[in-house]
Amino acid sequence: MRLPRNLITLGLGLTLLNAGLATAAEELPAPIRMVQEKGARILGSFDAPDGLRGYAAEYQNQGMALYLTPDGKHVLTGHLFDAQGKDLSREPLERLVYAPLAKEMWQKMEQSAWIADGRADAPRVVYLFSDPNCPYCTMFWEQARPWVDAGKVQLRHIMVGIIREDSEAKSAALLASKDPQKALHDHEQAGKASTLKPLAKIPAAVRKQLAGNMELMESMGAAATPAIFYLNAEGRMQQQQGAPQPDQLAEILGPR
């Protein structure tokens, strides 16, 4: 899954819980219930032209606009455009689906087992799912040095183990270290010369952290490392798969 760019705004609209409760208070028409029974979450309703009634749904982390016909017997799915080409589905989906979904995902990343890289009071936070054996994670670590060293950005490495057989044990070694931040810094700075050793026996608490990180990564549709999540200038959450190109760094990390 790749969250649609420029549609996900933090802080707008209701939370998923509140939106769900608001919709639950309504008596859903049969065609809308049919869509719900197929696995979609109905998160809210909205006004639509010409007697249509709009419903915002979420299915597998994607927004879906539903339009109930005036007779209440049929439902249309997809985007609705006016004569000027304006997408009338965009604002309701952003407000009722993508904004609260992004907020929920950001909160889950905040609560995950991450290792800080940079000052705690940095004005900008960037999350990335990181594997100790990932050369592109090291590349992004190096790319970000000017921003991190200047105190402008804090990277938060959500550790996972997916690349090699010893990746999980190496992530465990970092998380279980007496100083995870220094251990990660030393590992990334050394690059191929890193002396990081996989943990021979992963403590149950650390294994639980890694399992939670992996579950979160999968739920967010990330399939490779680094999977980078950040807020753009408008406060909208964006996703970057893999090490970014040089001309993308300012978008992800802010002004240098």
UniProtKB/Swiss-Prot annotation:
The gene is dsbG. Keywords: Disulfide bond, Periplasm, Redox-active center, Signal. Belongs to the thioredoxin family. DsbC subfamily. Gene3D superfamilies: Disulphide bond isomerase, DsbC/G, N-terminal (3.10.450.70), Glutaredoxin (3.40.30.10). GO terms for cellular component: periplasmic space. This is Thiol:disulfide interchange protein DsbG. It is found in: Periplasm. Homodimer. Residues 1-24 form the signal peptide. It comes from the Bacteria. The keyword Disulfide bond applies. It holds the Pfam family Thioredoxin_2. InterPro entries: DiS-bond_Isoase_DsbC/G (IPR033954), DiS-bond_isomerase_DsbC/G_N (IPR018950), DiS-bond_isomerase_DsbC/G_N_sf (IPR009094), Thiol:disulfide_interchange (IPR051470), Thioredoxin-like_fold (IPR012336), Thioredoxin-like_sf (IPR036249). Involved in disulfide bond formation. Functions probably as a disulfide isomerase with a narrower substrate specificity than DsbC. DsbG is maintained in a reduced state by DsbD. Disulfide bonds join C134-C137.
